[in-house]
Amino acid sequence: MHMLIPTAPTAATLSSSTQELLHAREIRKILIKLRYLPLIPVDYLGLHGHIHGSYQWRFKIPRALQTLAASDSWQDPWNPLVLGALYQFEAVHHLPVEPGDMGIRGLPPTIEKALVHAKKNDPDPWTWILVTKFPRPEEIHLFMGGHGWIFQSKANTGVMHATPDGTWPVYARDTHTAMIGRFPIPVPKAQVRLYEAAKSAGYALQSVHYARYHHHWVQYQHYDDPDIRWVNYFDRGRAVHFYPRASYGFPQSAGCVELPKSAAHKIYALIHYGTPVTVSHSAVGPWDPPGSAYLDAPQKSQQLHLTYQEIPSKSSPRSVHLQLVETAVKRPTS
C-alpha cells in the first residue's frame, strides 16, 4: 500500500514559495464565491456587542458533518474541508493538486494567479465520505450536498488500527494502479519470548524478524498487487478502493478502506478531487434518512449590523432600557 503511490501533499515535501499574493482569508473567499467551498458568510453578535464573522452551509447537513465542521476552525490553513476545496479547484483548472507551505497559505505563484483570475464555478456537486468502524459492520457512507445520503456499502478498514480516525481530502485518483507494501501479521507475545529465549540459549534458529506495530508484535508479509481498481488516495498511502474479499464489514486491510467491486466503482464515479474522507470510530446520530429534504438552493442570508436603541417608554432618569436593532447591510456588488 505504501510504495507505488503519488507523493502525499504535505508541507515537508514542498519547497518554500515566494511572497504570497493572497492571504488565507482571500483564498477562502474566492473558493466560496466559485462554489468550491459550499458556504455563505454570515455575521453574528458576540460578547461585548462585537460582530464576528462565520459561515453557513448552502444546504442542510447531517449531525456528523456538523460535528466535523465544528471541530476545526475555518481559519486553520490545514482545515481539511477548505483544503479539499482548493484541491478540487486545482484539478478543475488542470493545476498540480498540492497545498502550499502551510495548507492554503504559501501557495505556488501559478496557483495564486489562477485563483485571482478564476471565473469557473465548481462543476461537480460537493461530496463527503464518512467511514464508520462501529457499530459493526464497518461501512462507507456518501453524502452529496443538496441531496443528502446517496450511497452506503460495507467496507473494510485496517487491521490493528492501521486506518486512523480523522479527515483528509482526496489528493490523487486512479482507475487502475499497483500497490506494493508490507502487511502486518500479528504474532503472540509468548512466541516472541520463546524465540528470544531459544536464541539467547545458543540454539541454531532461522532468523526471524519481529516488530512492534500499534502496540502489537507482528511479522511483516510483503505484498505486490498489480491490479487495484478505482483508487482515491486521501492520507499518504491510504486510499478508498476496490479489493476482492470473501466478505466485508470488518478490519482486513493494511490501512486502506476496501470496498466491494460495484461499490468502489460507484464511489469513484460520484466523488472528485478534494472530497473529504472522514474515518470515524462511530457514527454521530441521529442520521438523516436517505431522500430527506435537502436544499438545492442556498439558504437566504443577510449581513446584519446590530445596534442598541433606547426604549423611552421603559426608561427613567435612573435606568435606561435598550433593545437590539438589526439592520441589513447591503453587500457591494462585484
List the predicted regions and their residue ranges.
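Cell-envelope/ECM-targeting effectors and their regulatory/trafficking segments
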Residues: 1-187, 191-194, 291
